[in-house]
Every structure is written in C-alpha cells, then in structure tokens.
Amino acid sequence: MTPAELSELITETARTTLDAHGLDSSVVPESATVERPRNPEHGDYATNIAMQVAKKAGTNPREFGTWLAESLGAHEGIDEATVAGPGFINIRLAAAAQGKIVEDILTVGANFGHGDELAGAAINLEFVSANPTGPIHLGGTRWAAVGDSLGRVLNARGAKVTREYYFNDHGAQIDRFARSLVAAAKGEPTPEDGYGGDYIQDIASQIVEANPDWQKLGADEAQELFRSQGVELMFAHIKRTLAEFGTEFDVYFHENSLFESGAVEAAIQKIKDNGNLYEADGAWWLRSTNFGDDKDRVVIKSDGNAAYIAGDIAYVADKFDRGHNLCIYMLGADHHGYIARLRAAAAAMGYDPQQVEVLIGQLVNLVKDGKAVRMSKRAGTVITLDDLVEAIGVDAARYAMIRSSVDSSLDIDMDLWASKSNDNPVFYVQYAHARLCSLARKAEDLGVTREGADLSLLTHDREGDLIRTLGEFPAVVKTAAELREPHRVARYAESLAGTFHRFYDACQILPKPSDDEQTVAENKALFAARLSLAAASRQTLANALELLGVAAPERM
C-alpha cells in the first residue's frame, strides 16, 4: 500500500466513520496528509486528519481519532492503528500490504511515479531562450537542465508539454553582434558595446571563408551578411550544444517572425481597440497598472519603434492561440520585473493572467580549488555550458543544476562533481543503480529468480525502510510537478540510493558460496522476495534518473 493509497483509505474511512456516528462527513478533505513518523517505533505512517476535521464535524480530535483508528485497524492491509497525543493516528501496515508496493512497481515498470492529475493541461514551457549573440552561459545552463527535467515531470503527471525556445533574433543586440563579427573579419578591435571572445573570431572566419568576396559589399550589405549568417551559425551552435546536453525542444520560435508576420502590429491594434493602450509624451503606453504591474509600460516609443514588450504581447497571444492553457516562462535572476509585465500582457490581450507563470532562477557560480572561476577562454567573459560539460561531464552538470531549488543561488564545486566518490551526489546515485544491475546479473549467474517470492517475508527494519521509501516516489513526482520543483526528484534519488545501500549492507539478498543446498532451499522464497525488492529499487531509481535526464548506468 503506497502513501497515496493509504491517504485514500483514510479519507474514505473517515467519512464512513462520521456517517456512522451521525456527524457531518462533508468536512473530510479530498486527501489526508500521510507522513513517516520521526520515531519508527510509532509505526509506518501517521496522519493528523482527526485534528483537522473533528471540531468541524461536531466532536473532539481524541474521540474521533479513537473511532477512526478502530475502523482503520479492521482493514486487512493495516496491522495496527493507534491514537497518540491530541489525536494523531499512528499506523502500522501489514507485511503483505507493504510488499504490495514492490509488486505494483514491478507491474507498472517505467510508468511507476506517473499519474494523470494534469491530464487536459496543455502547457507551453519556455526556457533557456538565450540570445543568439554567444554561447549558452551558466544561467542558461541551469534552465537547460531544470527546464528539461520539469518538462519530463509535468509529462509524467499527465500534462501535454510543449518545450519552447524563444530565439531573440530581433533588436539592437543582433546589430551589435553583427558589428562585432564585421570588426573581427577586418581584424579591428571589438566595438565598445560589442561581443568578444574566440567564438566571435571563429564565426567571422566561417563567414569569410563562405563569402570570399564579402569585402566588395557596401557597409550595410556587409552588416546584413554577417548579421544573417552569424545568427544562423550561432543558432546552430546553440542547438548542437543543447542536444549534446540532452535538452531537446519541440519548438524554436523566432522573435523576428512576430514582426515579419504582422503579429506585433495586430496585437498592438487589438489593445488599442480594447482601450488598454493610450498615448502620452509622443509614445503609446500599455495600461499595465490595471493588471497588477507597478507602472505602465511603453509599447511604441516616441521614435515610432516597438519596445521589447510589444513582442512579448504578441508572443503570449500566439502561445494561447496555439491551444495552450498554461504558459510557463523560466527566466533569469534579472527578470523579476517580467512577472507582472507578462501577466499584464496576457490580460491586455483578453487572456487569463493566472494562466501565466514565471519562474525566476538565481545565479550560478563555479568553484575550483576553493576559488571562484569567472573567465572562459571560449566565450571571453563568461563560463559557458560547453566549458562546464568539458570539465565535469553531462550527467554531473545536469544533476548539479537540478538538485537545488532555483530560488537560491548555486555554487558548483567542480572538483567535487568531477570526483568518483560518494560525496558526489550523481556518482552516489548512479553507483546505486549500477550496483543493483550487478546484483541482478549475479542472481542470474547463480540461477536465483524472483519466482515464488513471498513479499510478506520482508519484515527486516531495513527492508521496511526501503519499501516505504519506494512508496513515496509517486507523491514526490506529483509534488515536483505541482510546485514546479524537479529538484525534489534528485533529492529523492539520493535518499533512495542511501536507503538501498543500508538494506544491501544489512540483508543477505543472494545465497553465499558457503551456503549448503538445504539453506538455499529453505530461504528460496526470502531470496526471491529480496531480489524482487532490489528489482523494484532499480526500476524506481531508473525512473527518477529518467525524469532528471541523467543516465542510469548498468556498470561503473
């Protein structure tokens, strides 16, 4: 019985118990909180539902708790239910009910941890969206890992997710990029407001090689040549880097297409027509304060050019018009002001601003030999995704980025994450998976199978710990999806790995070479049960790593 199944049983029993005593059962919530007690001697799980609903139902927590514990204790899957303190109910599962978790995992396999509570959600998940003016930096790397993992988690709980990259190929930064490339091609210094680094010279050299007569062009033509081909080459590099990092997108949306298609012009006209745009000081302003922003925003500047928010307005409308009912933006630490701005853009266009979510990721710092690493030879001024992968590998880079909440800044110790030690979280988790695979191979060599497993024999404390940890996985994934926090899956994987290692050290899973035939025969059902528990652990660990986009190696 998983915690989710136990929660359902508790709520059903609470309703029938209140009905039986002539009390109001409508006060029982849809789900009951089920937690592991701090002291294992108190039982496998505990719930505070009696304290939540007793007063509303017309009784006191202790009395209702006593009734409920008695009813729960009569259930075949529960060995014991007792009331403690002001009304806590401690529950100990029957051995067979605990073992059923193992059976369920082995039955559903790769789908263990999946659910359907987000069925019907069509989510546009936009992340990374780095400017095509340079390689992806550490902030973008964090979103490349976290965004991809979040997409996997949301999919696992039933949502249809479109992973989208907004390609900022319109605006002044592209002009500066083009001027930087032209300067590099001419052997001139980088413009004061331009972009430097080896990658600029590399791209400029590629354009020169492909266009040997470029110097015959006029200044404007040369600028346009380096602009268009430079953006194309940078875009190809970004896509290749992301693919090698294990991050794929369903849609690469070009900002410039919003202007070329007339979408920006149409959006501006729409908000003019609905009264959400007004003219002042020679410019046109969005009444964004009407929708919770701290100030109105310029949409058309006094020189007649569209401000950046004009593209945002057209873009959010395009997302909803494509059939999405939730738009999640994953933005950098310097984008806090965009939360109200993007919601105002949606509201001004007639969409529900509550269907716009903005996640803000904090800064990432690298540390090596105890010192901050700040420079990249490749990019000139910042550390890139390519630099990080070269130093510690894809799996370590992804795991390091995902395992902490994006609400806090992140320091990555490159020496730690490159090490092959249990102090390295990704090594620790992957080693547990490899150890489980090795165990399965050894069982096959010995002729030990899961056939005839009696899961009710799994009564050792370490077995119980492992089973309960396995049972938590669906709730962990569900919460990770609800809160947009895939780091919960990474922390769970570490907890599961540690719980498995303790089980492995405490319980004999396979026959020893010194065991005689009689001993092996007498323990056949137990060995099969423990091998089943190990197989369920391997499956769950593999499922967690899949949600993180991290490899689950069979050998290390």
UniProtKB/Swiss-Prot annotation:
State whether keyword Ligase applies.
yes
Kindly state one GO CC term assigned in the UniProt record: cytoplasm
The compartments listed are: Cytoplasm
Give the enzyme's EC designation. Answer: 6.1.1.19
Annotated SUPFAM superfamilies: Anticodon-binding domain of a subclass of class I aminoacyl-tRNA synthetases (SSF47323), Arginyl-tRNA synthetase (ArgRS), N-terminal 'additional' domain (SSF55190), Nucleotidylyl transferase (SSF52374)
From the UniProt annotation, give the residues forming the signal peptide.
none
Q: What is its main location?
A: cytoplasm
Enumerate the UniProt keywords alphabetically: Aminoacyl-tRNA synthetase, ATP-binding, Cytoplasm, Ligase, Nucleotide-binding, Protein biosynthesis
One of the Pfam families matching this protein, by short name? DALR_1
Q: Which domain of life is it from?
A: Bacteria
Q: Which reaction does it catalyse?
A: tRNA(Arg) + L-arginine + ATP = L-arginyl-tRNA(Arg) + AMP + diphosphate
Record keyword Nucleotide-binding present: yes
List, in alphabetical order, the Gene Ontology terms for molecular function in this entry: arginine-tRNA ligase activity; ATP binding
| Alphabetized Gene3D superfamilies for the sequence | Arginyl tRNA synthetase N-terminal domain (3.30.1360.70), HUPs (3.40.50.620), Isoleucyl-tRNA Synthetase, Domain 1 (1.10.730.10)
Which Gene Ontology BP annotations are present? arginyl-tRNA aminoacylation
Q: Where is this motif: 'HIGH' region?
A: 130-140
Q: Self-association or partners: how does it assemble?
A: Monomer.
List the PANTHER family. Answer: ARGININE--TRNA LIGASE, CYTOPLASMIC, ARGINYL-TRNA SYNTHETASE
Which NCBIfam families does this chain map to?
argS
By sequence similarity, the record places it as follows: Belongs to the class-I aminoacyl-tRNA synthetase family.
The name this protein carries in UniProt is Arginine--tRNA ligase
Task: Say which species the protein is native to.
Answer: Corynebacterium jeikeium (strain K411)
The record lists the lineage as: Bacteria, Bacillati, Actinomycetota, Actinomycetes, Mycobacteriales
Q: Which gene encodes it?
A: argS
